[in-house]
């Protein structure tokens, strides 16, 4: 049952901007399950499959653009790569620091508050840019936001959506770009960590639950992003921050 709960938490919190890693760590503590970074990474791979389904149209469009040698699509891929670099470098250089943060609920509590603030401000931001209109500097800025999302308590979807809106992307485009740029990072981290674990029926069930609940949460996030109702999650993150602070 605990593995089903963790899979459900991962799927719902990975895309809803409330930090899946922060919730997994907190609930592992509450349910007396020893935090396992490798198992968490495997669940991230399960939700990665949900991302691919969600942005499948954009992925196909990009691939067609590359095969037909359209310059703007090569430029878009380069921007996505640029957005990926900061998190990759930071994760490689400070891997031990990142892993240690998973055991400190006080730190996680602070990061939940960072997520809450970014979501509250996001509802007030407006943008008109498409994928092809952002600059390489814009892509780097969004990537820097993704970099700090490595820490538990900071929502990757929430903070990168905030970054994309900050540089002027239209709301739905900002959401889609957030997930497109997340694919390489989640895939890399997942492969790196899952090589350390042995697959069993429990973790596979967790992965399936994470995938299905992830698809549901993506649809919810899309609707709330467009309707500018992300502050709902901001209030929730403040509540979780308080709980994590006193539990820790």
UniProtKB/Swiss-Prot annotation:
Molecular function GO terms recorded: symporter activity; undecaprenyl-diphosphatase activity
Membrane topology type: Multi-pass membrane protein
EC main group: hydrolase
Biological processes annotated in GO: cell wall organization; peptidoglycan biosynthetic process; regulation of cell shape; response to antibiotic
GO cellular component: plasma membrane
Catalytic activity: di-trans,octa-cis-undecaprenyl diphosphate + H2O = di-trans,octa-cis-undecaprenyl phosphate + phosphate + H(+)
SUPFAM superfamilies: Proton glutamate symport protein
Residues annotated as signal peptide: none
Residue spans crossing the bilayer: 4-24, 40-60, 74-94, 101-121, 134-154, 174-194, 201-221, 228-248
Cellular compartment(s): Cell inner membrane
Keywords in alphabetical order: Antibiotic resistance, Cell inner membrane, Cell membrane, Cell shape, Cell wall biogenesis/degradation, Hydrolase, Membrane, Peptidoglycan synthesis, Transmembrane, Transmembrane helix
This enzyme's EC code(s): 3.6.1.27
InterPro entries per the UniProt record, alphabetical: Na:dicarbo_symporter_sf, UppP
Function: Catalyzes the dephosphorylation of undecaprenyl diphosphate (UPP). Confers resistance to bacitracin.
Family the UniProt entry places it in: Belongs to the UppP family.
Further facts: Bacitracin is thought to be involved in the inhibition of peptidoglycan synthesis by sequestering undecaprenyl diphosphate, thereby reducing the pool of lipid carrier available.
Record protein name field: Undecaprenyl-diphosphatase
Organism: Thermosipho africanus (strain TCF52B)
């Amino acid at each position: 049952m605990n593995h089903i709960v963790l899979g459900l938490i991962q799927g719902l919190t990975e895309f809803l901007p409330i930090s899946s890693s922060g919730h997994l760590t907190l609930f592992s503590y509450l349910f007396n399950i020893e935090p396992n970074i490798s198992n968490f990474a495997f669940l991230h791979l399960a939700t990665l499959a949900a991302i691919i389904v969600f942005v499948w149209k954009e992925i196909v469009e990009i691939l067609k653009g590359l095969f037909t040698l359209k310059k703007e699509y090569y430029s878009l891929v380069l921007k996505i790569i640029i957005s990926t670099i900061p998190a990759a470098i930071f994760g490689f250089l400070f891997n031990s620091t990142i892993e240690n943060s998973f055991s400190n609920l006080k730190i996680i509590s602070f990061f939940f508050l960072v997520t809450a603030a970014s979501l509250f401000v996001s509802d007030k931001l407006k943008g008109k840019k498409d994928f092809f209109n952002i600059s390489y500097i814009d892509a780097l800025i969004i990537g820097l936001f993704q970099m700090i999302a490595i820490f538990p308590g900071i929502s990757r979807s929430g903070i990168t959506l905030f970054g994309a809106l900050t540089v002027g992307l239209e709301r739905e485009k900002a959401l889609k770009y957030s997930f497109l740029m997340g694919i390489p990072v989640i895939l890399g981290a997942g492969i790196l960590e899952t090589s350390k674990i042995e697959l069993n029926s429990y973790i596979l069930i967790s992965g399936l639950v994470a995938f299905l609940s992830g698809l549901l949460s993506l649809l919810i996030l899309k609707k709330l992003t467009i309707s500018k109702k992300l502050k709902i999650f901001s209030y929730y993150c403040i509540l979780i921050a308080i709980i994590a602070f006193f539990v820790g």
